[in-house]
From Swiss-Prot:
Its main location: membrane. This is Tumor protein p53-inducible protein 13. It is found in: Cell membrane; Cytoplasm. One of its GO terms (biological process) is response to xenobiotic stimulus. May act as a tumor suppressor. Inhibits tumor cell growth, when overexpressed. Residues 361-372 have a biased composition (Basic residues).
């Protein structure tokens, strides 16, 4: 009898294991080989949200990105952690740690902070790694100002590249890894629904992630007060107008392995696979809300344009009224009056009316300039001239 074909999730898992060659990922296989779990491997823990804690760099541990896991953790969890480490870090370092609890057997540390996970959350891990890497770069840039310009090469404030460098030639987008890890569930394990928040999980998880990753405790383990005005303003700017519940902080608890933890409880829900651990690539990770632009006042050109528009409108209205008045005046017919005499066709012109109404001036007799002033004498006639 032919056995049934394996499910697609198992085929995808085998393909990824062969592609990544995970037998080269584990840094200390000899230490894990000598350990034995008396009760066997642990069952899968309940799926809870990751937790950001403060940790100290141990002796012999390279400063950078390190992946810790409990040797008795479930095989699926260890395999997912190895795949995540190989995809997000160029040369990952995986170290077994017996001090990890059962509910969160996977820990990701980077430059003094740790991300404790019960299940692998690629979006959380990628966004958290990128955030820590940016903080590290900002600190290094600030420290450069205090160094001398004559120093060359790596300095204590700017360590040289080593194992644990973020990203590499096999860096993969976090959504791709999240899609693969969602199908990596042991047989019989199903992801339970989270209730009515299922529809808005992506927005809630993204903004809750940014609010949680910014919470780091101090070595004293003091309680962070939610009544402080600065923290409230920062959370309001980060969360925006969403329906995310406020982050509840708990007091820091000092553990035996030297970590001071601060729990950040956020809204439950499955993470939306967004963000990438690569700093040089464009990431669809959640971003801070863009502040509204300040309204600018009117400029001289806008005022001139407004005045020109008003003047054109006034001229147009004036021209329209003049045209209407002219049409009405032409079509208007005057009735008979006592002042204006009746005419045959009632079409008298102004000149005709003036000629008829104005009195004619009296004519004066003009004297000719050729007439003599003295009357003629009888001797000065033409007969006397002819007799001479």
């Amino acid at each position: 009898m032919v056995p049934p074909p394996p499910p697609p999730s198992r085929l995808l898992l085998v393909a990824l294991v062969g592609l990544l060659s995970l037998h080269e990922v584990v840094a200390e296989p000899a230490e894990e080989a000598g350990t034995r779990c008396p009760e066997g491997l642990w069952p899968l823990p309940p799926q809870v949200l990751p937790r950001v804690t403060y940790t100290q760099v141990r002796q012999g541990q390279a400063e950078g990105i390190t992946f810790f896991y409990h040797p008795c953790a479930h095989l699926w969890l260890k395999l997912q952690l190895a795949v995540l480490a190989h995809l997000c870090v160029a040369k990952p370092t995986l170290i077994p740690d017996f001090s990890l609890p059962w509910d969160r057997p996977l820990v990701l540390t980077a430059w003094g902070t740790a991300l404790e996970m019960a299940w692998i959350e690629p979006a959380w891990a990628a966004q958290w790694l990128k955030r820590q890497w940016r903080r590290r770069r900002r600190k290094q840039r600030k420290s450069v100002w205090f160094l001398s310009d004559n120093l060359f090469g790596p300095t204590p404030m700017m360590p040289a590249p080593r194992r644990g460098k973020l990203c590499g030639r096999r860096c993969v987008q976090a959504p791709t890894l999240a899609f693969a890890l969602r199908s990596w569930r042991p047989p019989g394990v199903e992801v339970t629904s989270r209730g009515p928040r299922r529809s808005s999980l992506s927005v809630v998880k993204k903004r809750g992630l940014r609010a949680a990753l910014g919470l780091q405790s101090t070595p004293s383990g003091l309680r962070v007060s939610l009544a402080s005005s600065q923290s409230l303003k920062a959370q309001q700017r980060t969360l925006g107008n969403s329906s995310v519940a406020p982050v509840s902080l708990m007091t820091g608890v000092t553990e035996g392995n030297g970590r001071f933890r601060t729990e950040a409880q956020m809204p439950s829900g499955q993470g939306n696979p967004g963000g990438c651990a690569c700093p040089g690539q464009v990431s669809p990770a959640p971003r801070a809300a863009v502040p509204p632009r300040v309204a600018r006042g009117p400029t001289p050109r806008t005022e001139e344009a407004a005045w020109a528009a008003m003047a054109l409108t006034f001229l147009l209205v004036l021209l329209t009224l003049a045209t209407l008045c002219t049409r009405l005046h032409r079509n208007f017919r005057r009735s008979e009056s006592i002042y204006w005499g009746p005419t045959s066709d009632s079409q008298d012109t102004v000149a005709a009316i003036l000629k008829r109404r104005l009195p004619l001036p009296s004519r004066r007799i003009k004297r000719s300039r050729r007439r003599p002033l003295l009357p003629p004498t009888p001797d000065s006639g033409p007969d006397s001239e002819s007799s001479d």
